[in-house]
């Protein structure tokens, strides 16, 4: 993994910082493991904008990732590491001994030729997946399930991980990078190690066009608008003189949006405390 600061041959390259991984495969993905990824432009089925700041973007295919890791006791070998435009982490193409191929998240330290396996009694080794009731306390894990059999939902971005800190009866306690501590069923599966490509956070796009390639449109400040367009608009100077609100007058910047209080009992320590 190399971090390259571009030469200032143009204003767009002056501040750009790229993350280059020479070990990534440069060919096309496996055709049986991709599907169409259509663009919405932030519009719903009526053609109305429901999410702002979305539009454009380079064409891309969605890579079908195996988040469940439920093919038990069949050893697999890492064929190659690939770039995935749909996520910050890289992905690994694995070949099972029965000939089946799947994409998984590339763990930190996973290399071409590495051998991995999933199962209840899998070895505690980078890339292996098993239920958390069989994982030692203090182990760093990622791709953690919230509901058994649903597939990993926690710690999937580049450089993220979760630490297993205790086990009690049929539940385990994990600590997230955000500081949140919560309980999960011990039957939930997780993958050993942390997600790779942690250097992706050091990437600097360098120019507005690089955001447009990713489908991100400009975000205009409310204070820069007219009163007809935004509650913060108009007036002299930059002060809008009221509590921050959305373009529709709803409270923002600090307003709590969590609705599912039913699962509050599983959270021991909130990330905001």
Swiss-Prot record:
Please give the SUPFAM superfamilies that the UniProt record associates with this protein.
Nucleic acid-binding proteins, Translation proteins SH3-like domain
Q: Does the keyword RNA-binding apply?
A: yes
Q: Where is this region: Disordered?
A: 221-263
Can you cite an annotated GO cellular component? large ribosomal subunit
Coiled-coil stretches? none
Q: Which GO terms describe its biological process?
A: cytoplasmic translation
Q: Which GO MF terms are attached to this record?
A: rRNA binding; structural constituent of ribosome; transferase activity
Q: Which UniProt keywords apply?
A: Ribonucleoprotein, Ribosomal protein, RNA-binding, rRNA-binding
Q: Name the Pfam families for this protein.
A: Ribosomal_L2 (PF00181), Ribosomal_L2_C (PF03947)
Where does this protein have compositionally biased stretches of type Basic residues?
253-263
Subunit and partners: Part of the 50S ribosomal subunit. Forms a bridge to the 30S subunit in the 70S ribosome.
Query: What's this chain's function?
Result: One of the primary rRNA binding proteins. Required for association of the 30S and 50S subunits to form the 70S ribosome, for tRNA binding and peptide bond formation. It has been suggested to have peptidyltransferase activity; this is somewhat controversial. Makes several contacts with the 16S rRNA in the 70S ribosome.
Q: Which family does it belong to?
A: Belongs to the universal ribosomal protein uL2 family.
Q: What is this protein called?
A: Large ribosomal subunit protein uL2
Q: Which organism is it from?
A: Buchnera aphidicola subsp. Baizongia pistaciae (strain Bp)
Gene name for this UniProt entry: rplB
């Amino acid at each position: 993994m190399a971090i390259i600061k571009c030469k200032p041959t143009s204003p767009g390259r002056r501040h750009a910082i790229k993350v280059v991984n020479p070990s990534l495969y440069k060919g096309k993905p496996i055709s049986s493991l991709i599907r169409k990824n259509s663009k919405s432009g932030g519009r719903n089925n009526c053609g109305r904008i429901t999410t702002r700041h979305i539009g454009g973007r380079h064409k891309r295919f969605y890579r079908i990732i195996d988040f469940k890791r439920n093919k038990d006791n069949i050893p697999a070998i890492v064929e190659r590491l690939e770039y995935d435009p749909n996520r910050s982490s890289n992905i690994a193409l694995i070949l099972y001994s029965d000939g089946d191929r799947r994409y998984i998240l590339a763990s930190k330290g996973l290399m071409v030729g590495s051998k991995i396996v999933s199962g209840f009694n899998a070895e505690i080794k980078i890339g292996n997946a098993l239920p958390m009731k069989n994982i030692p306390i203090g182990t760093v894990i990622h791709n953690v399930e919230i509901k058994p059999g649903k597939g990993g939902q926690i710690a999937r971005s580049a450089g993220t991980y979760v630490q297993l800190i205790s086990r009690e009866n049929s539940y385990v306690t994990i600590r997230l990078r955000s500081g949140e501590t919560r309980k999960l069923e011990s039957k939930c599966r997780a993958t050993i190690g942390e997600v790779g490509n942690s250097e992706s956070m050091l990437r600097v796009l360098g120019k507005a066009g690089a955001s447009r390639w990713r489908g991100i449109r400009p975000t205009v400040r409310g204070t820069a608008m007219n009163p007809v367009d935004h509650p913060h608009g108009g007036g002299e100077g930059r002060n809008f003189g009221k509590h921050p609100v959305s373009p529709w007058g709803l409270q923002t910047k600090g307003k709590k949006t969590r609705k599912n209080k039913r699962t509050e009992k599983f959270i021991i320590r909130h990330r905001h405390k």
